[in-house]
Regions:
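Intrinsically disordered, low-complexity regulatory segments enriched in Ser/Thr/Pro
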Residues: 41-91
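Compositionally biased amphipathic helical and low-complexity segments enriched in hydrophobic
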Residues: 7, 18-20, 24-26, 48, ...
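Negatively charged, low-complexity tracts enriched in Asp/Glu with abundant Ser/Thr
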Residues: 1-41
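Short intrinsically disordered terminal tails
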Residues: 1-2, 101-108
């Protein structure tokens, strides 16, 4: 079991997530890696491991998020896309929890 599968195994009973591969998502990935895909109220996320990026903790995780946020001066919510690199399995799980529960600072 790889790290992405391990993370999925720890959260699959809490949330409606998909464990698949990046090419199957047809989201513009140019390489094929295992990925956890999830949708939350304001958007969606992809969590995958980039094995080509050096990391002192092992594999480098990439948490990519697309979300909408309402601002006081716009009638329609604005779409944002960002990503970061959780350093551990536990950090990746915490990020999933925060988004799925609507508690991440990006979407508050």
């Amino acid at each position: 079991m790889n790290d992405i599968e391990l993370i999925y195994d720890k959260v699959k009973d809490k949330y409606n997530l998909t464990l698949t591969n990046s090419l199957a998502l047809n989201e513009g990935f140019t390489w094929d890696v295992p990925v956890i895909y999830g949708e939350f109220q304001q958007g969606r996320f992809w969590l995958y491991a980039d094995e080509d990026v050096p990391n002192p903790h092992g594999i480098e995780f990439v948490f990519s998020v697309e979300y909408e946020k309402q601002t006081w001066f716009r009638k329609q919510p604005k779409k944002y896309h960002t990503h970061w690199h959780p350093q551990t399995i536990e950090q990746a799980i915490q990020d999933i929890d925060k988004f799925m529960l609507g508690k991440h600072p990006f979407i508050k």
